[in-house]
Swiss-Prot record:
Domain of life: Bacteria
Annotated EC: 1.7.1.13
Organism classification: Bacteria, Pseudomonadati, Pseudomonadota, Alphaproteobacteria, Hyphomicrobiales
Keyword annotations of the record: Cytoplasm, NADP, Oxidoreductase, Queuosine biosynthesis
Name of the protein this chain belongs to: NADPH-dependent 7-cyano-7-deazaguanine reductase
Active site, UniProt feature: 52 (thioimide intermediate), 59 (proton donor)
Reaction catalysis annotation: 7-aminomethyl-7-carbaguanine + 2 NADP(+) = 7-cyano-7-deazaguanine + 2 NADPH + 3 H(+)
Renumbered residue ranges of the record's region Disordered: 1-30
Biased amino acid composition, Basic and acidic residues: 17-27
NCBIfam families from the UniProt entry: QueF-II (TIGR03139)
GO biological process: queuosine biosynthetic process; tRNA modification
Amino acid sequence: MSVTDVSGLSQLGTKVDTPESPEKAVLEKVPNGNAGTDYVVRFTAPEFTSLCPMTGQPDFAHIVIDYIPGDFLVESKSLKLFLQSFRNHGAFHEDCSVYIAKRLVELLQPKWLRIGAYWYPRGGIPIDVFWQTGAAPEGVWLPDQGVAPYRGRG
């Protein structure tokens, strides 16, 4: 087992305020101690919040991010703060979902990444957004994201 070098991180182990916006949020990475081995990392944010850009009302989603790392892993505290930065950010569901994925791809250059964003209904219609970088490498176990389709009270 190896210890990861965290010397270059600016947020881990310190008190950090929630960033003002996703654009100002600092995503950080750490070396992947298992580079060269294909495996899936999953982050789940069941209480993701952003704002409707038209009404300013809150929007809620259950977000699942799966990725197969290359040389780097996302540092989880920086990811948490990045996701929290959407709380006061107005954007459509699709824009939030794809922006999250593209920021992670830009930072990590993973072998593969997908996001499933399961948005709770607004105007009676749930919106689910799915995006991925391409086909996953063969032979990697990709579990279902485990989020049932929205059924309301039915």
